Amino acid sequence: MLTCIIKYHIDPTKKAAFEQYARNWGQAIPRCGADLIGYYAPHEGSSTLAYGIYNIPDLAAYEAYRARLAADPLGRENYEFAQSEKFLLREDRTFLKLVSTPHGAQK
């Protein structure tokens, strides 16, 4: 299992547009095959950093998921929304693998 973390630099004056973008992905991403953990908008501290986080089985599954997302009507609409509103200043993706187990008390 891989976790994809998307780090966004957003225009702080367009936070509401980013939040709409995140809500749209909240529908499209699970429908297209990824396990969405969530989208996170700035609250305190930096007003320009936001994140999207989801799990995917492997890179081959990621490629298939991206193709489905590009063909999804809401996915296409959301890509176009981001382009037209220009609230995303930068977007970086990294794939991480969980290498620890929970550290709390086990029941």
Residue ranges of model-derived segments:
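Short, structured motif recognition centered on aromatic/hydrophobic residues
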Residues: 2-7, 18, 28-29, 50-53
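Short beta-strand-to-loop capping motifs
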Residues: 7-12, 54-58
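Residue-level recognition of beta-strand->loop/alpha-helix junctions
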Residues: 40-41, 97
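Short acidic/glycine-enriched loop/turn segments that link adjacent beta-strands
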Residues: 45-48
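Short, low-order "capping/linker" segments at domain edges
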Residues: 91-107
